[in-house]
Amino acid sequence: MKKILILAVTVNLLCGSSFITAQNNIPSNLNISVLLDLSDRIDTIKYSNPSMEFYQRDLGYLKSVAKSFTSSMLTKRVMQLNDKIQLYFDPEPRNPEINELSNRLKFHVTKNNASLELFDKINKEYTTSALSIYKQALKDDVYVGSDTWGFFRNKVKDYCVEEGYRNILVILTDGYVYYKNNLLTEVNFSTYITPQTIRSKRLNQSNWKEIIETKKHGFIPLDLDLSNLEVLVLGINPVKNGNNKYDYDVLEKYWSDWLYGMGVKKENFAFKTAVLPANMDNIINSFISKKK
């Protein structure tokens, strides 16, 4: 018979945190969503990296996210457990096997199902099933891009934001945004940004910020209230050549202006390059545990 987890034995039962943390009035229940960019950024031929392939870095980040999620359960009373974690794509892959694997990464932990076995399963699935997703995507070798703008426009409120939760969206991407079936422009705003876009707008020079602010470049704004959402963007991998020296700065500016415009608070947004997972682990844990 499954053993119901008694978190941190008697100590946590007596001293566990309340639903709303006393120090910063932040809901204690987590609702973590992961948006996975399965564009050609994971291609091991086009973007090969001898130290560690980028999809392998993603896997390390996912492992840290899952570990931070399950570890947070150990700081709470059993009766308070009502926490969620799930993974999304946009567009959804045509391969049904990938979509089935993503269903294995959706968990809702409550007082009725909490157990050490469940926590182990969450950590295991975010390692094994996630690896299978990447292997299948690499095998299919069909990259149509990632519709990050469209995900925010059509899905983020329904999928990633719930009342009474700390809503955290972790986005694994190289920072560029491109989906061939959603290429819109409104004056100097667009639904996409690529290295070519940056060069064509002359944002690859030292006065890039002045150009963005005076000519109003950026992602097309969305009329959304995301003040109850925290966004952690991981895996930024700017093009490294003489014509794109400022890509990281431009990408961060595009993302931050866009998210702040939808109400995401500055302290609830982080934009991190694709460092090795061992160096990212503490960053992820600190963001999720709110140790900033």
Task: Give each language-model segment a name.
Residues 1-30:
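Bacterial Sec-dependent N-terminal signal peptides
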Residues 27-105, 110-164, 168-170:
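Von Willebrand factor
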Residues 42-46, 96-98, 178-182, 240-244, ...:
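Extracytoplasmic/secreted cell-surface and envelope-processing proteins
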